Curated annotation (Swiss-Prot):
InterPro entries: ODR-4-like. The chain crosses the membrane at residues 76-96, 428-448. The keyword Transmembrane applies. Coiled coil: none annotated. This is Protein odr-4 homolog. Belongs to the ODR-4 family. Its main location: membrane.
Length: 448
């Protein structure tokens, strides 16, 4: 028996709007959540048109061969950054006129594997045994509105399509919000102070992978309680009366506790690594995750919040280096504090879910609105934007205790008397000390 997708009726309305545009074809992404029992689709977003495609895609003037799968995968990468924990790209959709329907399934198969490959490229986490490996493809005929829903196993390149049910829900889907603020403190040694941005980005990723293991192994408290991973998130509901068994809190607070490595009796060997500079990511970031409220499990809540932590740090690092490669370093970058992208949340209309985006210091709310329209195909009002992280005022480190999200590049010689309070290179051994801050900062300390 194939998978069943329970779909928010807003997706049906969105498809109706696309049909009215009378294009020969439209590609896009499906957003939602997989679970062991049911799968949920909450949003659909069409792929932004390329500039040279505007005339080509008018009815009667295009063929499916003109679909650029790399362009669709780039859209998926950009959109993936805007999804909080628990939400993901479920698959792809293709809307065509009747004369183009014949080759739709071949195109969808190619797209779904390309999109998944792109989405997995820079993840700091790996799928586990409980993750669903099937991705959905949806073909809609713009004339008859007939829907063909199939799934592919993305772990098998030779996977054959399986039929699936696409069920619209007249009532809104119910979601549980997991709210979390996490302190991040990562120091990454760099072997050379003259690394290119690409080389530096690779080094940073290797360091983040090690940090990601700490997050994966961390202990999470839900509303101050430790819960068994395999248990229901709300065990007390089982003991309550039937009249109140339908109730569950809509927002719970998570606290993430990372512990220092345990010291045992086994012999350990110190790792000596030559280092010219180091990069430090520090501070507190705002995170959230969503799981469907139908008998939520602890393991699902853990997965949602931990993956959101990893995703938001990875996204900010990627965006920072993309901005540097595109615009070059700012003047005086070696000695000044620069804001990292600020996380901004936007509620989905008619739902308790929220999407997110990132705002650089020189960008405005209008830029965010334009980006949401381009990537998510959603119009956002300025008063709907939520800023849980304050902008960094670029103060000195000792004045930055309440400042989130900043980027600090600093050059200091180590032969000064007070340099040992930061970083010290002594006979090839690098000793780093933790610097308390509520900002997310990236600091380079160059060692001479």
């Amino acid at each position: 028996m194939g998978r069943s997708y329970y779909v928010d009726d807003g997706v049906e309305k969105y498809f109706s709007k696309l049909i009215q545009q009378q294009k020969a074809y439209v590609t896009g992404l499906l957003i939602g959540q997989y679970s062991s029992q049911r799968d949920y689709a909450v949003l659909a977003a069409q792929t932004p048109q390329k500039e040279d495609q505007s005339e080509e895609t008018k009815s009667g003037f295009s063929k499916l061969e003109g679909i650029d799968d790399e362009w669709v995968s780039m859209h998926a990468s950009q959109l993936g950054r805007m999804l909080p924990g628990g939400l993901m790209v479920l698959g792809v959709f293709l809307m065509t006129s009747p004369d183009l329907s014949k080759d739709a399934q071949n195109v969808l198969r190619k797209l779904v594997f390309t999109v998944e490959k792109s989405s997995m490229k820079n993840r700091l986490w790996n799928f586990d045994d409980d993750d669903v490996s099937e991705r959905v493809t949806l073909h809609i005929c713009s004339a008859t509105k007939k829907i063909t829903c199939r799934t592919y196993d993305i772990n098998d390149p030779k996977s054959t399509p399986k039929p699936a049910d696409w069920k619209y829900q007249s009532s809104g889907l119910s979601w549980l919000t997991i709210d979390c603020s996490v302190r991040v403190d990562v120091t990454i040694p760099l072997t050379s102070s003259s690394l290119t941005y690409q080389e530096r980005q690779k080094s940073i990723r290797l360091g983040l992978v090690k940090w990601a293991k700490e997050i994966e192994d961390s202990l999470v408290l839900f509303n101050g309680q430790v819960k068994d991973k395999s248990a229901d998130l709300f065990e007390e509901q089982k003991k309550s009366s039937r009249s109140s068994s339908h109730y569950s809190p809509q927002i719970i607070t998570a606290n993430v506790l990372t512990a220092a490595p345990l010291i045992d009796s086994t012999r350990s060997t110190a790792l000596v690594q030559p280092c010219k500079s180091s990069l430090t990511i520090q501070g507190v970031v705002k995170c959230c995750g969503y799981i469907h409220s139908n008998r939520p499990k602890v393991k699902d809540a853990l997965q949602a919040v931990k993956r959101d932590i990893l995703n938001t740090i990875q996204a900010r690092c990627e965006m920072l280096f993309e901005d540097m490669m595109l615009n070059g370093p700012s003047k005086g970058t070696e000695n000044e504090v620069c804001p990292l992208p600020q996380r901004v949340f936007v509620p989905i209309k008619g739902s308790s879910l929220k999407l997110c985006d990132y705002l650089f210091g020189d960008e405005t709310s209008s830029d965010l609105q334009s980006h949401f329209l381009e990537i998510m195909d959603q119009e956002v009002e300025q008063n709907e934007l939520e800023f849980p992280e304050k902008k960094c005022s670029c103060t000195q480190p000792e004045e930055r205790e309440s400042e989130p999200v900043s980027y600090n590049l600093e050059s200091k010689p180590v032969d000064q008397a007070n340099s040992s309070s930061k970083f010290l290179l002594n006979k090839g051994l690098l000793i780093s000390t933790v610097v308390a801050s509520i900002a997310v900062i990236i600091s380079f300390y160059y060692i001479i």
